[in-house]
Each structure stands twice: as C-alpha cells, then as structure tokens.
A protein has these predicted regions:
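Soluble N-terminal domains of membrane-associated systems
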Residues: 1-62
C-alpha cells in the first residue's frame, strides 16, 4: 500500500462519521507522521506495514 492509498483509505473509512473536523485532523496527523518518517530515511513500505490497515485505525478513532 502506498502513502496515498493509506491516506485515502483512512479518509474514506472516517467519512461515515460525517465529522469533517475529525476527518481532517486525522488525515493531517497521519500525513505529517508519514512525511516525518520518510524524512528519517525510512521506506514507505516499512511505514505502511507499521501503521497497518487504515480501516482499523479509523475504527479505533470513531
């Protein structure tokens, strides 16, 4: 899974909340986290494996 696929999956999974603020805050949090980790020379694949399924993350947020 790529960074963009992860972020879009997270956004889609959170969309059922109809809370745009919650969606935006979490989208930006994970986008920033991924960028920070990439800047530490970690691979996108490694970061995505660490984060796991965006649907499970969304479920824990809701």
């Amino acid at each position: 899974m790529s960074k963009n696929e992860f972020l879009e999956g997270l956004k889609k999974a959170l969309s059922s909340t109809n809370d745009q603020r919650l969606i935006n805050e979490n989208y930006e949090f994970y986008r920033n986290y991924i960028e920070e980790e990439l800047n530490k020379q970690r691979s996108e694949e490694e970061i995505m494996q660490e984060l796991g399924d965006p649907r499970l993350i969304a479920h824990s947020i809701r």
